Amino acid sequence: MIEIESNKKKDYQSILTDDALNFLEKICLTFESSRQEILENREKMQQSISSGSKLSFPKDQKIRKDNWTVTPPPPDVANRNVEITGPVDRKMIINALNSGADVFMADFEDSTSPTWKNLMDGQVNLFDANNRKLEYVDPKNEKTYALNEDSNTSLFVRPRGLHLDDKNVLIDGKPVSGAFLDLSLIHI
């Protein structure tokens, strides 16, 4: 069962919907044990390296030597010569999407201080950007910022890393993965 303090949920009901939280619960039930295994293996590898072991390629030469390819990127992101990365605040998203860059990557990990307010406001901002309803009025000078109608910058999202938990959302009393939460809210 998912738990979120009611005072933390009430301001973000537009994104913390039943569908989003049900999706989060499914992701956690499906992938949490694998995530924990990955984190344990990462810790073991770090201990091994710290003890003097050298890195080496895994014994999967067949994959590296095989003749395989990946699907080409969609045409609208095939050219990524200019890419901006930044926090998920409204003004930054608007300016980045209006910049003419090929891609703006909204960054929930390194560019955003991980407070509940910043993270949830960021989710609201992405929802509004995807629906082309993102506006911001600067409280200092009352200047209004809005998405240009002709903006064609692609919006990418970098969720928090798999190693970061979100203590504000619990399943069975345990914090959920920040990455799982970010992806669940973006997905819906």
Question: Where in this protein do the model-derived segments appear?
Answer:
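Low-complexity, highly charged intrinsically disordered N-terminal segments
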Residues: Q13-K62
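Long amphipathic N-terminal alpha/beta scaffold segment
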Residues: Q47-K91
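Hydrophobic faces of well-ordered beta-strands that scaffold small-molecule active sites
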Residues: R80-G86, F104-A106, T153-V157
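Active-site beta-loop-alpha junctions enriched in small/polar residues
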Residues: P87-D89, E109, R158-L164
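Short acidic catalytic loops
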Residues: D102-T112
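A short alpha/beta connector and helix-capping loop motif
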Residues: T112-P159
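Conserved small/polar residues in nucleotide/adenosyl-binding loops
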Residues: I186-I188
